[in-house]
Amino acid sequence: IGYHFARYIGQDGVKSLVTGEEYNGESVTWDDEKVKAAAESFADFAKKGYFSKNIATNKYPAGQNQEFAPGDAAIVICGSWLPNEAKDSVADDLEWGYFNYPSVPDGKDDNTANNIANQVLAINKDSKMADKAFQLIEYITTGEYDKKMTEDALCIPTDKANSDAWPTELAGVKEAFDATTTFYDWAAGVESNNDITPVLQENTQKLASGKLDAAGFIKAMKEAAGQ
């Protein structure tokens, strides 16, 4: 739902929405017309049957392993790590495809806004072996080892020298990856408020399963936010 909101109101708008604070000049509430439009379009997806009938109880990784992998679902909303996670479950001859989360009419961001590199290798500031830790990180993310990772873990290469080593399974990702103009935080910042995240998750599931309409979703979130 974070990406969906961000297409309408941008990442700063999403952060403002869930925290109730202004972000980089953006101030958005649950009464905002674009927030309502986002909720209405999400509810429309549910009404048209775009979501799994099991979505109300779908817990990771059930959707990708039990519905997408056997071919019962045509699309799964996920990241470039999916081919690696699902490689033992999908058919050997599966032809992987990919497209960015779509643009929306009159949206703040289009489909060139993406979340990239949301996992990191870090060194503790108090480490007494920081130099050696950095050498290990270099070893893992460059040269032959990096190329080996693309083969065994089906991941995007981190070393520019391996820019031609993208796995076949991720061939469809590269064009959109290279075209990225705006970089999102994880989930476009929708989890910026720990107090509201569980309620948002619960009501998003209800919205996607048709248990709430857009107005009911907005009402529930306003109550949770104290608006």
Label each PLM-derived region with a short phrase.
Residues 1-27, 73:
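Extracytoplasmic/periplasmic solute-binding protein
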Residues 7-12, 48, 126-133, 206:
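Short helix-loop capping/hinge motifs at secondary-structure junctions, enriched
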Residues 23-55:
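Glycine-centered hinge/linker elements that transmit conformational signals in sensory
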Residues 54-69:
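Short helix-initiation/N-cap motifs at beta->coil->alpha
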Residues 69-78, 94:
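Alpha-to-beta junction loops
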Residues 88-153:
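Extracytoplasmic/periplasmic substrate-recognition and gating elements
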Residues 115, 151-163, 171-227:
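C-terminal capping/gating helix-and-loop segments adjacent to ligand/active sites or protein-protein/ligand interfaces
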